[in-house]
Structure formats: structure tokens, C-alpha cells
């Protein structure tokens, strides 16, 4: 039986165990569930004197082959090989990117310590096997008596150099090193050389060099032999057990004094971490206390979810204790948590969203009315972003639906922040503030920028970058002090981790080092900025001081923006770093070149033209985070990428505006993307009509792409599906439900003050893009049709291009067999058949055949008697006259109107896009609701007794699409009331009750007043008929 007690103590030396300890800390800080060889390799590279780092430098082609790592020569070599720190920095960045790609576990779900990955267990076993084989050979060479040799199994402690070699054998580590320009085989050879040379220059292979009086080689060899541990029983030997909890406690309880790997820098590293944490906290407070800008809501952006959550928790604690409140303005500030899981937020109903917003508003207002400040903490912003899926065209698109709870939540939170911070001129309101704060990874924040409109605009967010580690927190760039173009050569010898913020800001803000093209664009934007500022105030209130602080800050921001944009865009081909052919394309700067940063556009899978639409995102620890990109796709606001303008002298110049697309978008690809998004939205909204939805989407997008009006006619009995089509099109094509104009010609203006023709004329003059849903177009009058015909025939708007507004017209027609007057209702009856004791129960199909037409006959008789006495003016008369022929008894005016009506209605026949949407006959939820309501009155019995109940399929079809709220109330107030009457009047609780459809009749003949139940076509009562 394995004891497992010596799992770590008997397999790893102190140095190797210390490396795994720090790897565990790194994995836990990043929120990873397992410790992989990538964590170990990143930890080994974190020390400047580590064995792996020295081996990487030695394996580089530019390294001198005659050089040995003597302690006295190490510093001298560092100054004469400037490219080696850059190469190691690049390698650290590659490992950091690889770690960012590993899956993370959310904070609430992350319990306990990370476990050992299978790849790391295999690496430890390889290291143990190599170490044991080497020690056996050494022992055999030192033994003088062969007969004393033992064949027992030896368990040895794994040295650090063997651990490094085994880690380099891992495929994932080798792949990352190859991407950074290193050869793992060459590095392994250098590790072996370094371990041998350390015998002559020091007693350690980890960079901690000993004095000249260090033991000789024979003494060290003797010490290595004494490290061997013999077991009496070979079964007692134990390999690495990843599930054994002792290794975790061993790492966590190990003191810093037992860490020779980072012994020289452990105290300073801890102090540096504390100092950086204080700087990060101060950056967040500075964002909260901003006064000259609207972006006062910080979002903590980091590479680890657990780390950012811990950072916010520390910020909450310090704010409550008042430890970081310097000016007193953040006193009595309380956090209000308001966040959801990504899955829960996607499937919320409108009622749930409104309830949550109401509770949030109540909490915030209770704090502000009592003179306190509030910070709405939204947690990880991943729940605010829609899911992005790949479509068939190779691009990406967001999932659209008829109602988006995410958009609703985001908009309501933005409105709440604006209302609370803009509370009028009340003096008490000026001291009350409401902020919103969240956390996000770099990928999540980029997706928040890709929203339309972006979350940064809606919530006035300002990102603050908080890397999880000082050494490995490279974010997306190598932090360097070489930001200006012509820095002195003294700066080249500075540490790459050192950073002079004031010097960089001074250089970037005051020196405009751009190409002529970008300088022209800067001048143009600066002029427009000054012009906009002059328009805000009258002349007697404008500041005549050219060096005013606000204007100076704006100009400095423009210079900084254009410097970085020009440096990123135009100088990538001319400025090559000493990296050589670095696969990632990340230049890291030198004494004469400026460092650059890369964005996360590649990781999101965007196309080149989509990448160019966004300028580079720069996350820096020292100056919080500056996001300088615009991921908006509004082509009407941004126009083309290259714009022609005229300067003051009248010369025509070509300028490149920041934030606009650098390449002309492919119209075909863009149309395909929009078409796929619209098809997906329509199929999700009306899943039973997938083929028709695709045809509708294709016809609409064909006209939209040509910047023409879209005209379609939808016939059929599925009124609900027609309305869903209009709502989905308005949201997917024009981006909002507010662009939908609904005109129901059956109402004839009774419910609304304005007539349909007046409403249509007003909306046609609206400059905004509109989707018209016109129901029952066959009931339109001549004036209404004249307006539509004039719009349909108007071609000047397309030719001249004066009016770029587009409109989509969705015209619907009801089936002639299903045309319902607004005063018509369904007639529903209950057929009750008592079960005779001596007869068998008949099948329900026989009952429907024999007794299913009683109500229809009654309806027909009522209709015939009603029609014989009255003339229903609501019934559309059939056109029996010959088309174009005028009645001889009509006046000339009547003839002209009829001729005009005929000519205006002819345009309907010219609309080619026609579709039919009929309701399916599948029983829906209405039948289940009816059965459930029936069983509340007549419960089922186990022994075959009780009342049998069925619903006619025709009735289920007619009830399809009724509003659930009205239908539920009808079931309780009308249907169940009728059932109680049947139950009280029945002699026995047996028999068959069938709910049948009795046709559609006029409500006047039905005797029910104006309209059916709650203005629906449901009857106010259910007729009951008994059959013996």
C-alpha cells in the first residue's frame, strides 16, 4: 500500500519545490483550475538570474560562444548584449499570451487549490527518472567494491536543472518558445552546460553564487550522493500524486527563506507588489473623482477574473474604512451589487428586468436621498455582452431576437446613472453622486466596445488596467520607457520594467511627431474642436486666454492620440526592432525605435478591414488604461476612410481621419453578414416558418443594399407572425423597435384621434428610417392608397440622392375566410354527453360526428335571421361591376373618385414580393391551458371514472396567437364559471365534455355589446348543450 507521506519531500529538492509553489500561486491568481508546464516555465523566467533565463540567453545566435557565466562577468555581459533582455522579455510575453488562452474558472465556482495537470505530472515523472538514472551512474563510479552494489530501487530528489529540462520537453512549452524564436533543444543543451559550469563558478545552478571558498567538486559530488534515499521495500517508492493534498500545503506553508530561486528578490518583490497595488487603487479613485470629463465610472480590466474580483473587494473594504479617501468626497459611499450570470441574463423576461431595475432604483435613491453616495457594482461585464457566433459567411455576428433583456438592462442602468447625476439645480443634489463599476477581461472589454452603441458610451466607462503580476502582467505589450522617437542612448540601458511616466507624457503630449498626412488631420480636428468650444458660449463669455487649462488638455490629448495612431499605422514597416522575424509581429523597441503594442483584434478573429476600423488598444499600468479605438460601424456618421477637404487657402487635400475604416468595406460581404443576421433573427422569432422567413429576409436586404424602399405583401391567417416579422425587421435592420409604425386599417381611426391617412402622411415626412406595418391593406380608402402609390412611384429620391432615408413597407392581407370585424367574436360551446349505465362509452370522434354541428346550425339560423332584418355596413361589398365602368346613376365626382381609387390600388398588383403566413394546426399551449383549467373543476380519478374532456382541433387553431394574459383571465372568469354550472347541475360526475368551435358571428347578434371579452374575440359566455 502506498503511504503517500513522502510525495513532495522525497521527490523534489527545495529549489524545485519552490518553483512549483510559485507556479501554484500564479495559477490560483489567474483563476486556472490546473497547474500546467506553462505556469512552471513562466515562473522560471520571472527571475533575472534563473537557470532557464540564462540558458535562453546563451542559446541565442547572437551570444558569444566563448562566454561563460562567471559571476564577475555577468553584469558586464548584460550591458554588451542589449538584445538578450529584449528576447527574454518577448519570451515572457509569449508565455503570458499562452496563459491568457487557458480557460479560467469564475470566482464563485473556484474553490480550493489548483491541481496538477497531466502534462505537469508527466514532466515530473520524466525528471525523476532522469535524476535517478544519473545518480545511479554516479554511485556506481564511486563504489570500490562491486559486491556491495545493491539492485534496490532508488528514489531521489529531483534537482532544478532536471525539472527545467523536463519542462522544456513539454510540447506546449516548446511551441511557445518556438514562436518567440527559441529552440527548446538548444536551450536544453545550454541548461546542461550551465549546470556543469556552476560547479566551477558557484555551488548553485539557480543563480545564487557562492564565495571563492566554496566546496570543491569532490565535496559537492559527495553531497549529491548523500541525497539518495533508500527504501527497504520497493513498493514504498511513490511517484508524484496530483490528487494528494500534501503538496499543496507544503507549497503554501513553505517560508520565503526556503526559496533560493527568488531569495534575493522575495522581499523587494513583495514590496513592489504592494506599491503597485496602491498605485492601482489610486488610479481608480482618480477616475471616481474626475471633474472635467463625463467618464467617471471605472471598469477594472485585468487578465485574471479572480484577481480583479479580489482587487474590487479590497477597494470596497478600504472605501468603507476610509483609508483611501484623501479629499473626503468619497465619505459615506456604499456599494450596491447588481450583476447576473451570462446565462440568466439572456433568458430574462421583460417583467423580470423591470422588477430588478425597480429594486435597484429603490436602493440607489434611498442612499442618495439620505445624503450618501452609491457605486453600482455590476461584476464581470461578460453578462452585458451578447453571444458572438460564426456565420456561414466567415464573419461574426451577434445573436438578435425580438426582445433583448441585455439591451434593456444596459439602457436602464445608463438612464439611472444619468438621472441621479443630473438632478437639477438643487444644491443638495450636487454633493450626491452615483457611479457604476465593473470588472472585465481584455477580450470582454473589447466586445463591450463592439456593442452598438458601445457600453463605454452608455455608461461613461473609463478602463483601468490591473495586471495580475508585476513580472507576468505584460497585458498586451512590453512596457518600455522608449515611447518617443529620438530618445537618448542612456535610456536604452534602463530596465525594461522601469517606466518614467512624467517623461513619457511630456514627450508624447507636447511633441507632435507624425507624418504629414496625420499632421493635417490633427490640425483639422484641432480647428473643429476650437470651433465647437466657441459655439458653446456667447462671445462675451468665451475665454480669450490661448493657454487655458481645459483647451490645453484637449490639445495634448489630440497630440497624444495622433502620435500613437501614426506610430502604429505608418511606421510598422520602417521601424524594425532587434527581434528579427518575430512571429507575433510585436516590435519591442531599441535605443532608436519606439515600442509598440498590439491589440486583441487578432484574438477575436476579426478580418483585416475590421481590424483597421479600430485603432490600437493600449493598456498600461502606469497611466491607467487608454483605449483609443472606435469599433462603431455607423457608416452614415463616419463616411469613407479617405476624405477630401479644403484648407484655408482653398487647396484640396486628402486627409485620413482617426476612427474611420482604413479600407473600403466590401459591400457584398457586408450585405451577406446583414442578411444572415436578419435570417437568424426571423427564424428565431417565427421558428415554424423558416423557409418563408429566409425569402422575406432576402427580398428586404436586396432593396436595403440598393438604398431603395422595400415593399412586401404578406397574406394568410397568422396575424401574430406578421407582427413579429415587422418587429424583428425594425430591430435587426434599423436597430430599434421605435422605428416601427403600426397602422391597423380595421380600427378606422376609432381608437386613435388621427385617421390612418393622416398618420401615414405624417410618418412619410419623418426624416428617420421607418418600418411601416399596415394591416388589412384591402380595407384602405382612396386617400390612403394615394399616399402609398405616390411613394411607390416616386423615383426622384433614388436618382438625385437628396433624401437618403429608407423605408420598409410591410402590407398585410387577411384570408377571405378569416376576415373578422372588430365587433365579431368566436362562439364556443360545451357538449355534454352523459354516460348511460347499460351502454358503452362512445369514442370522442363519434360524438363529434353526431353532435358536433348543433351549434353551427344554430349560428347559421341566427345569422340568416339577422341578415334578413338588418344591413351590415361593415361587410365589404363585392365588386360585381366591370372594372372601369361607372354607374349611370352616380355623379361625376363619384366617378372620378372611383377612377382615382382604381388607379391608386393598381400599385398593389405591381408589388412582386408576396408571401403567405398561415397558422399551423399543431396544438399549442392553449390546449394545455384549457385542459389544466378543466381539471381544476373536474379532477381525474384513478379507477377509470370521472369526466372525460376533449377540445376540438379547429377551436385550438382559432385560439392560436391570443394574448396569454387575456386568455388566462377568460379561462378563470368565463370558462371555469360555465364548468361550475355544469358540475352543480349534473347528477353524476361521469360522462364526456367536449369543447367545440361554433363559428365566428357578429357580436350584436350574439348579444354581447361592443367587442368580446376584454376587447378580444373571446366570448363573454360559453353555451352549454346536453345530450343524453
From Swiss-Prot:
PROSITE patterns membership: CLP_R
Region ranges (Repeat 1): 12-102
Repeat 2: annotated span: 116-199
Source species, domain of life: Eukaryota
Positions of short motif EAR: 871-875
Tissue specificity of this protein: Detected in roots, seedlings and axillary branches.
The protein's role, per its UniProt record: May function in a transcriptional corepressor complex.
Family: Belongs to the ClpA/ClpB family.
Listed name of the protein: Protein SMAX1-LIKE 5
Gene transcribed to yield this protein: SMXL5
